[in-house]
Amino acid sequence: MFKNRFFNTMQIQNQVQLKPFNTLSLDVTASHYTKVKSIEDIEEALAFAKEHELNVLVLSGGSNMLLPQQINALVIHLDIQGIDVLSEDQDFIRVKVGAGQVWHDFVLYTTKQNWFGLQNLALIPGLVGASPVQNIGAYGVEVGEFIESVQVYDRLLKQTGSISAADCHFSYRHSIFKDEPARYIITHVTFKLLKQANLKLNYGDLKQAVGDNLTAENLQNQVIHIRQSKLPDPKEYPNVGSFFKNPIVNTQEFERLIAQFSTIPHYPQANGNVKIAAGWLIDQAGWKGKQLGVVGMFHKQALVLVNYANASLADVKKTYQAVQHDVEQRFQIMLEPEPVLYNNLGLIENHTE
């Protein structure tokens, strides 16, 4: 039975099932749960957690997290809405977006408004507030390129603040929010988008699909089509999208790999390093379409781990660690998981522990 406690606008619930709120569909119960729609709600929730000596786990779209069966912590579920135009000129428009907005819906909205920049990131699961955390990226675009600033509640200073894109330290699947996960709760993200067409068509299959119809809408539609053809729908096949990061190796390491495996897909980076396609490594290690019990790597895209039937976190860990082992044996590369791993106290845990 739920026990509900009401504050000014916020409600705390006990023993709440989080299965609908994580895209891997893990069976998870939170000892304490609340949905927040404002900064005031966040302040009340944090005060409750402090009073009851609870850790805080901030839940966004649940598309990049691995959760245990029981979480003894306060889960704060972000639901801050709103899309507000701050300013615009001939070339740019600045838009402030609530952290609880669905990411894909926001991308569709920008295209409808004829704003450019985010079309390559269509159909990425999750909410706007999670996009800066791991600097989401796809088809040659990272969200950090179009973020002007991130609005936060700073738990250390106990106040709201704004962090410029430069101070977010965006890099491949990384940001300051990963370095200090317990400090900031993202409330809004301010984007600086283009008003003139500037389509990023760096990826071969995307360039070919877009063809001569160089509109934002066509680019977005082709990205959606390609993703849907390769990636499983989480409602049908529970997953967290790309499970592993594409490893980045130095020149010496790359020369060793290319000498042994001449067809290895790779992408040169600005600093002389080389990004390797993790999906190809997993496929070559024999894991594409392979299952270990109720968890496996998807048959159309080896980079996606799928929960086929009521898997537990232990089942998931057993599978991804087996994939890591086999890839390392073949290529001497240790794959790093993308989703964040939590323990039963709601704290982030290292995947290697």
Swiss-Prot record:
Keywords on record: Cell cycle, Cell division, Cell shape, Cell wall biogenesis/degradation, Cytoplasm, FAD, Flavoprotein, NADP, Oxidoreductase, Peptidoglycan synthesis
Keyword Flavoprotein found: yes
Subcellular location: Cytoplasm
GO biological process: cell division; cell wall organization; peptidoglycan biosynthetic process; regulation of cell shape
The protein's required cofactors: FAD
Pathway: Cell wall biogenesis; peptidoglycan biosynthesis
Pfam families linked to this entry: FAD_binding_4, MurB_C
Superkingdom as given in the UniProt entry: Bacteria
Molecular function terms from GO: FAD binding; UDP-N-acetylmuramate dehydrogenase activity
Annotated EC: 1.3.1.98
Active site residues per record: R173, S242 (proton donor), E338
GO cellular component terms listed in the entry, alphabetical order: cytosol
Ranges of residues in domain FAD-binding PCMH-type: 26-196
Gene3D superfamilies reported in the protein's UniProt record: 3.30.465.10, UDP-N-acetylenolpyruvoylglucosamine reductase, C-terminal domain, Uridine Diphospho-n-acetylenolpyruvylglucosamine Reductase, domain 2
Stored InterPro entries: FAD-bd_PCMH, FAD-bd_PCMH-like_sf, FAD-bd_PCMH_sub1, FAD-bd_PCMH_sub2, MurB, MurB_C, MurB_C_sf, Oxid_FAD_bind_N
Catalytic activity as recorded in UniProt: UDP-N-acetyl-alpha-D-muramate + NADP(+) = UDP-N-acetyl-3-O-(1-carboxyvinyl)-alpha-D-glucosamine + NADPH + H(+)
PROSITE patterns linked to this entry: FAD_PCMH
Family: Belongs to the MurB family.
Protein purpose: Cell wall formation.
NCBIfam families, alphabetized: murB, PRK00046.1, PRK13903.1
PANTHER family: UDP-N-ACETYLENOLPYRUVOYLGLUCOSAMINE REDUCTASE (PTHR21071:SF4)
Protein name: UDP-N-acetylenolpyruvoylglucosamine reductase
Naturally occurring in which organism (per UniProt): Acinetobacter baumannii (strain SDF)
Gene name of this polypeptide: murB
